[in-house]
């Protein structure tokens, strides 16, 4: 889960925005890298699993910082589209922790998609473990978000999907 083929990453880069694009699938990351190279787009595609990010490495784990340490406060905006349901259903990451991570890596803006557990893709990922997601709702999503973000706007983009624009609250970290 992540940038996938880079549709939004490429669009941002074509507008002159410097992009770091991550996904767990090395094939889509390689494809995005080739496209970005051919078009000379400012995109750094990386293979990263947000649920198990790269740890610090090197002598005494101090030569190279962890992925999350390198990303702390590094981005003006973070897009998490079609990602949250993967982190919840596949990795078991609580909503609150997802928003905490987003607040740690963005300085300003979060664009994030809420996908209801009734969504066909969510149900496919859950594979009969629906009881684990009983408490997931738009209200719970928004409540978890408000600990770190102000909801600026949201738009329904499908029967079970909503995209939110959120502004990071100041002085949370």
Where are these regions (language model features)?
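A short, conserved alpha-helix within the catalytic core of class I
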Residues: 87-101
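S-adenosyl-L-methionine
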Residues: 33-69
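Conserved S-adenosyl-L-methionine
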Residues: 2
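A conserved beta-strand element that flanks and buttresses the S-adenosyl-L-methionine
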Residues: 79
